[in-house]
Every structure is written in C-alpha cells, then in structure tokens.
Amino acid sequence: MNGTEGPYFYIPMLNTTGIVRSPYEYPQYYLVNPAAYAALCAYMFLLILLGFPINFLTLYVTIEHKKLRTPLNYILLNLAVANLFMVFGGFTTTMYTSMHGYFVLGRLGCNLEGFFATLGGEIGLWSLVVLAVERWMVVCKPISNFRFTENHAIMGLGFTWFAASACAVPPLVGWSRYIPEGMQCSCGVDYYTRAEGFNNESFVVYMFVCHFLIPLIVVFFCYGRLLCAVKEAAAAQQESETTQRAEREVTRMVVIMVIAFLICWCPYAGVAWYIFSNQGSEFGPLFMTIPAFFAKSSSIYNPLIYIFMNKQFRHCMITTLCCGKNPFEEEEGSTTTSKTEASSASSSSVSPA
C-alpha cells in the first residue's frame, strides 16, 4: 500500500519518515505546499461568491413572478436548492478547513460535510435526469396527449430527494463511510480502503451503477430522442427559416447540456473508479482534489445552462434586477415570439422550458 490508513482516514503518503498525522488533528502541509491550501480556500470563496447569488436569484425571481411558477420550473428550483446545499453544506466548510490546512471540524464535521455535499450533488444530478425525461415526454410524445402537470413535478421532486438520499445516507449508517480525501480538507465516500465492517466495495459499485451510469444513460437517451424529434419537425417545414433556427438553438442547448454533464461528473467518477479498482497504487493528493472540486463548480454553470437559457426566466430576472423595467424587452419579446412560432410542430415544447 502506497498510503497510510488510520481510523477513519486514508492519506496518500507512506509513513516511512513518521511525519504522517491524522487529518482531524494536524495540518497536512507535508502533503502539498501551504500555498495550495490558500489557493483551495480562494477557489472555495469564489464558488461561494458566485454560487450563492446565482442560485438565490433563481429562487427569488421565481417566487416574485407568478408566471414562472410552472410545474417544470419546480424542477429548476429544486436544482437551485441542491446547489445551495452544496454552497452552504460543502463549500463553506471546505473553505474553513483549508484555511487551517486540515479537517479541523473533526469526525462529525466530516460526516456532515460529506453528507451535504453528496446530497446536494445527487439532487442536482437527478433533477437533470427528471428534466431530460420531461423534455422527452413532452416533445417526443411517447404517451399521446401527455401534459406535464403539477402532480408530475411533485413526484419528480420526491424522486430526486429519494434517489439522492439513497446515495448520501448509507455512509452515515455503516454502508461505506465518509473520510477526508485529496488534500484532507473535504470529505467524500471511501474509495480508498477495504476497511472491515464497512463494505466499501459493494457500496462503490452500487453508487457507480445506480447513481452515475443509469443517470448518464437516461440523459443520453432522452436528449438523443429530443434531437431526432427536432430534426423531424424541421424536415417537415424545410422552407421555414424560424423552424431551422429553432433546430439549431435546441441542438446547441442539448449539446451544451450533455457536455456539461460529462465535464462535471466524468473526471471525478473516472478518478474515483481508478482509485477504487487500483487500491494501494501510488497517487498524489491533488489527483483526487482537482476533479472533486471541479465537479463542485456545477453549482455555478448548471443554473447558467438550465435556467438562464430560458428566455422567459431571463426576461423576469432582468426586470427584477432593473427595478421592474427590462431595457431589452422588445428584443426579448420578438425572440420569444419567433421561438413560439418555430416550435409549433411540437406544442412550443422544443424551446428551452
């Protein structure tokens, strides 16, 4: 083993020199330069500085404007709530611990940070899955005359919380565990050890299959079918410039969604799986730290993609920020009108939300 395993921690450094110390009790500056901890603290501060106002604004604007309180936007709000969970439950904790150079909050703090970060990330992930299924059901109409109602939205919300809890709760009750990872300033699922009594192997396999591969397959299937539906609608009206424009816009939106999904989760999942399947191999603390915190940046670009590309929401947001007046109202209105005309073949559901 090319690391040091202790009670409720694993440090990616052999203790041949005797300098390895518990990440709950001592600064870990022997792992990386102290400047790296300062950089991590600054990065977390940036995520808080950007993530909180973006997601809070999403909630505030939706509450203020009644026309935004639609069933589909319930899921978008759920995404914002999930991101706020990550901001308050994960980012603030990591910023504080990185200031000290170790997980100063102890074992209980590690459990709480790992739980809230995992819960927020999983709620966000499954919210994207529900959005993908909704787009597929409405646009492609596998069930004729299907209409996404408030009851469907509530069921979708319940499903996201159930699925997220099914991933975040088990490490708290003995199926796997949360331990400090990377630079030892944040906590995640134990991919690193085969500690007796925790069944880490079975939980990691369950987590990858049920909470990564299945969501990925569903998202690809739904958006793949959505692209086909848009192309078919455009082919039926080849002389309509607005339809062709709608096809290009939706194609661009879907490509951005899928790429963001992959960029957010694949590096972290790939590194975690490598560590799990090559336990005992040599790797540095930054090997897991960089993809883990890159995945956490989804709290910023998720709302930008899934909400700010929504013309109606953007109009309401600008109106709120400009004290009741949208200086771009005419442009926004004409764009929305053309979008509605272009998407008539699919009941105006081709355009983003």
Swiss-Prot record:
Q: Which residues are glycosylated?
A: N2, N15, N200
Keyword annotations from UniProtKB, A to Z: Cell projection, Chromophore, Disulfide bond, G-protein coupled receptor, Glycoprotein, Lipoprotein, Membrane, Palmitate, Phosphoprotein, Photoreceptor protein, Receptor, Retinal protein, Sensory transduction, Transducer, Transmembrane, Transmembrane helix, Vision
At what residues does the UniProt record annotate the site feature described as Plays an important role in the conformation switch to the active conformation?
A: E113
- The annotated regions of Low complexity compositional bias extend over 334-353
What's its membrane topology? Multi-pass membrane protein
Instruction: Give the location of motif 'Ionic lock' involved in activated form stabilization in residue numbers.
Output: 134-136
| Ranges per topology, Cytoplasmic | 62-73, 134-152, 225-252, 309-353
CDD domains in the cross-refs: 7tmA_MWS_opsin
Q: Which residues lie on this side of the membrane: Extracellular?
A: 1-36, 97-110, 174-202, 275-286
Spell out which residues are annotated as carrying N6-(retinylidene)lysine: K296
Sites of S-palmitoyl cysteine lipid attachment are C322, C323
Q: Which GO terms describe its biological process?
A: absorption of visible light; G protein-coupled opsin signaling pathway; visual perception
Q: Where in the cell is it found?
A: Membrane; Cell projection, Cilium, Photoreceptor outer segment
Please list the disulfide bridges: C110-C187
Q: How is it modified after translation?
A: Phosphorylated on some or all of the serine and threonine residues present in the C-terminal region. Contains one covalently linked retinal chromophore.
Q: From which domain of life does this come?
A: Eukaryota
Note the InterPro entries from the entry. Answer: GPCR_opsins, GPCR_Rhodpsn, GPCR_Rhodpsn_7TM, Opsin, Retinal_BS, Rhodopsin, Rhodopsin_N
Q: Which regions span the lipid bilayer? A: 37-61, 74-96, 111-133, 153-173, 203-224, 253-274, 287-308
Family in the record: Belongs to the G-protein coupled receptor 1 family. Opsin subfamily.
Annotated function:
Photoreceptor required for image-forming vision at low light intensity. While most salt water fish species use retinal as chromophore, most freshwater fish use 3-dehydroretinal, or a mixture of retinal and 3-dehydroretinal. Light-induced isomerization of 11-cis to all-trans retinal triggers a conformational change that activates signaling via G-proteins. Subsequent receptor phosphorylation mediates displacement of the bound G-protein alpha subunit by arrestin and terminates signaling.
User: What is the designated name of this protein?
Assistant: Rhodopsin
